[in-house]
Amino acid sequence: ILTAAIVLPMTPDNPVLQDGAVLVEGDRIAAVGSLGDMKSLAPEAELIDYGQAVLLPGLINTHSHSGFLRGTAEDLPVWDWLRLFIDPMHRVLTAEDAEIASWLCYAESLLSGTTTSVDMWRYMAGSARAAEALGNRVVMVPYVGEAEGYDYFDTLDDNEALIQQWHGKADGRINVWVGLEHMYYATPEACRRAVAMCERYNTGLHTHSNEAEAEIGEAMKRFGCSPIRALEQLGLLEPERVLLAHCVWLDEDEIALLAEKNIGVAHNPSSNMKLASGSAPIEQLIAAGVAVGIGTDGEKENNNLDMLEEIKIASLLAKLRCMDAAAYGAWNVLRSATIEGARAIGMADQIGSLEPGKQADIIAVRADTPRMTPFLTDGPFMNVHHNLVHGALGGDVCMTMVAG
């Protein structure tokens, strides 16, 4: 039995359970409710009391890249950043480098409350070994480039081999999706193969889209339409699970198309600000019914993987974009980091909320720190959710549990 001053299950209506508790049996949540009820259900269970803290679902980072280039590619717009630093890095990256990077990034993520990461990276057998040992949940998405000039990326054959070796392993904690770095890095035939692989292995597809304004003109030049419409033409919106990173530059018709196709969006506010890419229309996406998750992007364009910091930035950026202080409020952004993030990756039936039968992915965040004070748990000024979003940081996480 896990208990704390407050439990936030992140179920509909956003209940706030005072002196609540979560009963964990094996790798799953057995029950959620009052401490008294949990003791009655399991009188012999071990009790762990986190005191003045908040228990909530583990955070879901819907777009990240392992790596270790922090502080080496600074103050550059996105296309120069890619051309001058990221592509050259990929040309010299070794399998050993890549595995070490995943160990570091997964450890950082767990320490700051992220239990599930969507990680687009290279040589990902090493990433799988890191996740298997560290215990995090990961959706691994190889950087695939199958077009002239991008032969230093992984291939679809590499991606398929990774699926065959690791998809569903570590008691289901490791999943492997089909990855395309970008539609510009793939031929039409490669796009068709990618979609076929999703169907063959019943897995998802992840790629970048509409990150920078320059992409719009490039898509018009290559395809005669917007990037989202080009993805549609190439068949890349057809798999059952599709997650698009960024989606900064969208019009109303494209937002409607994403909603119609049930496409998940990974919003990366720190990266979009740092690379001067723009600000995604989060309020419009949510209003249209699109599942929006939060992503840190990589450590080199953030420069950390702290999801508690990221949700604050996401909320503030939306308020500035909309010039509306009520935009993307605390409950909505917390939902993006938990249950809506789970929906964006097609795993809302397994993770993202504290409900019986779901995986026991749970974190505890201290509320006895100066930046979480005052900690008001009821009444008209109840501020638990506001303080989590606008006050807490990854260093306040005092417990991270994955699969029990």
Predicted regions and their residues:
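N-terminal metal-binding scaffold of metallo-dependent hydrolase/deaminase domains
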Residues: 1-41, 53-55
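Divalent metal-coordination and catalytic microenvironments
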Residues: 5, 22, 27, 52, ...
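C-terminal cap of metal-dependent C-N hydrolases
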Residues: 10, 359-404
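Alpha-helical scaffold segments that flank or form the walls of functional sites
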Residues: 54, 73-136, 157-169
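Active-site gating loops and adjacent loop-to-helix segments of metal-dependent hydrolytic enzymes
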Residues: 69-100, 134-149, 213-239, 261-264, ...
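Metal-coordinating catalytic core of metallo-dependent amide/deamination hydrolases
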Residues: 126-249, 253
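His/Asp/Glu-enriched, well-ordered alpha-helical/loop segment
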Residues: 233-239, 283-373
